[in-house]
Amino acid sequence: RLLYAPAVEPSDMPILAYLGVDVFDDLNVELRSATSWALDDGSWTKVDTKTKDLQSQNREELDRWLLKIRTSIMNGTLRELVEVTSLHNPRVSQILHHSTSLLIEKGARRNVMIRANNLSLENPSVVDYQQRLSDYVPPAKNMVLLVLPCSARKPYFKSSSHKRFYNTIKEVDNYLALHIVSVTSPLGLVPRELEFCYPAAHYDIAVTGDWSASEVQMLREQFSRLEPEKHYLKAIVHAGSSSKIITELLRERKVDTIDTEAEKPSSFAGLEILQEFTRTAIAEIPVLSSKDRAKGEAIGLAKFQYGESSPFLAESEISGHMPYKLRCGDLATISPRVGGLGLTLAGAAKYAANGGPSVTAEDFKLVGDLFAVGVKSYDGHWVIGDQV
């Protein structure tokens, strides 16, 4: 079925399309044209003289505006168009704010790139990620937290700067006891195990080095979800221009924190400083084996993805390591396409048996993907992008 909204203001069309409206009409354009208003990129401007062809001009402009909306839907940029229109339309801003919780329940397409700005702090996918960080646990107790800056390339570990960071710290004895967490806006904190997960691997933002008050508060809330004081013995902050803020937030939580004060973290001098501080910080930290580290990575990632239903993965035979070779027996394996642990058929069956969501298909031989028309019923709670 199609959802139709009559006489809608053009500036409201992007937000209504974002929320599921399918069909609009030109009644509003007809009424506005009769009273000497000209449409320009979704907004109205009063004209002094009544133009003979104003009605046809406005219809053409409406066609261009609707084409812009359709194109943004196809390109996955409708959210960004909505955010732009909300900057000068308080009604759109209000609707966008109140729709966040509804859209979190619905879920999000996992291949949509988020082009972030300050308004993205309320993007449903961003809020959902931030809330689920409460389910995540670091790989082991008594580790040293290493906070690094984000990178333009996603996932971060593929970037040249993060490769330099890793090559530097792996020369330190017991480097597996270091836990890398990257700091970024609008997500806040991204542990290394979650870099494949949506939307951590699917966003882009202009890096300025400045943090707004709302972003600082977001970081504070993310640290309260991560609870570093419970999991880490120490913290090293090597995040460039963000280091001062991160250090203050960690010390608020009574974490023994070292700020390397390196202005250019990935420079030769910055890497030397990083290696020196990490070597000193983990000198007396209990040795963490690669096997225990891998098991902890799998548990943390499984809890983030599957919440209360995750123990069935943690109880399997964990092998391999991040980022590409982690396996949970014959139940799941790390998958960049899925964005985390991808279930096998055996894993999916066990997931459903342990309270995971499932769908019942019509009686036919399945070849390829299962579409909505072939679904008979479903059980459990799931949103767009979840595995069932």
Predicted regions and their residues:
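Short beta-strand/loop segments at the ligand-binding rim of alpha/beta enzyme cores
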Residues: 1-6
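Polybasic, low-complexity RNA-engagement segments
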Residues: 153-155, 163, 276-388
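Extended, charge-rich low-complexity interaction segments
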Residues: 201-236, 279-311
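Non-catalytic interaction/regulatory modules that flank or connect domains
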Residues: 111-178
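Peripheral docking tails and interdomain loops at the edges
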Residues: 242-291
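Short connector loops at secondary-structure junctions
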Residues: 175-202
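Alpha/beta catalytic cores of nucleotide-metabolism and tRNA/nucleoside-modifying enzymes
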Residues: 10-128, 138-140, 164
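Structural motif
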Residues: 148-152, 236-242
